[in-house]
């Protein structure tokens, strides 16, 4: 049974020192598409975190009964089932957001973070540790999404969660929104800037020059 220190390390590590986007450069595609608003970034964070944590848990529970030759198929079946449940819940209780997220919730099935943690961690680790690892990686992914979404919505539209924060010139205010920040390429540059800042602050994350 894992002790509290190990569980904390597995949970906090992917958020701070081993972030799946900032360090491993995984899950970037969806991060470009869903971060124009804080609302969609938050819902995507919750969706991926739930799928990653629960898929890790279920895969770990049956890991000793999965034949090696079909393990990827079993993993994808579990992940796909969870994604379908999450998608149906979103359509039932947050239909407008589900429409905005479009295919990106469905694409969680093939998300590198979810598949990677299932194969590299859940197949070799007890259930509780696997659950915490999935939770940590989902939150690490979400931390980047919410950071990028904050900048894009605030300075691209002058609002957060649809609530006006910076009074726009078109409404008699002082702020001229930067429409470029609402385009997907802006997220690419913001994520790049975040990675640069993190690696300046944590030089040990810089890849060795070969």
From Swiss-Prot:
Lineage, top ranks: Bacteria, Pseudomonadati, Pseudomonadota, Gammaproteobacteria, Alteromonadales
Catalytic activity of the protein: a ubiquinone + n Na(+)(in) + NADH + H(+) = a ubiquinol + n Na(+)(out) + NAD(+)
EC number(s) stated in the UniProt entry for this protein: 7.2.1.1
Localization, UniProt: Cell inner membrane
Quaternary structure, from the entry: Composed of six subunits; NqrA, NqrB, NqrC, NqrD, NqrE and NqrF.
EC category name: translocase
UniProt name for this protein: Na(+)-translocating NADH-quinone reductase subunit D
GO CC entries: plasma membrane
Physiological role: NQR complex catalyzes the reduction of ubiquinone-1 to ubiquinol by two successive reactions, coupled with the transport of Na(+) ions from the cytoplasm to the periplasm. NqrA to NqrE are probably involved in the second step, the conversion of ubisemiquinone to ubiquinol.
HAMAP family, per database record: NqrD (MF_00428)
Entries under InterPro entries matching the protein: NqrD (IPR011292), NqrDE/RnfAE (IPR003667)
Gene Ontology MF annotations: oxidoreductase activity, acting on NAD(P)H, quinone or similar compound as acceptor
Keywords, comma-separated and alphabetical: Cell inner membrane, Cell membrane, Ion transport, Membrane, NAD, Sodium, Sodium transport, Translocase, Transmembrane, Transmembrane helix, Transport, Ubiquinone
KW Ion transport (keyword) present: yes
Segments traversing the membrane: 9-29, 42-62, 72-92, 103-123, 131-151, 178-198
């Amino acid at each position: 049974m894992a002790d509290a220190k190990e569980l904390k390390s597995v949970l906090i590590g992917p958020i701070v020192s081993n972030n799946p986007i900032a360090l491993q450069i995984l899950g970037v595609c969806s991060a470009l598409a869903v971060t124009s608003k804080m609302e969609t970034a938050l819902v995507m964070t919750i969706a991926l975190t739930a799928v990653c944590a629960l898929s890790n848990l279920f895969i770990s529970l049956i890991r000793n009964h999965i034949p090696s030759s079909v393990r990827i198929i079993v993993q994808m079946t579990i992940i796909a089932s969870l994604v379908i449940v999450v998608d149906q819940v979103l359509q039932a209780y947050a239909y407008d957001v589900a429409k905005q997220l479009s295919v990106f919730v469905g694409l969680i099935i093939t998300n590198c973070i979810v598949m990677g943690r299932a194969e590299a961690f859940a197949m070799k680790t007890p259930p509780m540790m696997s659950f915490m690892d999935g939770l940590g990686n989902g939150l690490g992914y979400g931390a980047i999404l919410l950071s990028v979404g904050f900048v894009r919505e605030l300075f691209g539209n002058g609002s957060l969660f649809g609530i006006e924060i910076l009074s726009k010139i078109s409404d008699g205010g002082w702020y001229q929104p930067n429409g470029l920040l609402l385009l997907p390429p802006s997220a690419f540059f913001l994520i790049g800037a975040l990675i640069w800042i993190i690696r300046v602050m944590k030089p040990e994350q810089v890849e060795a020059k070969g």
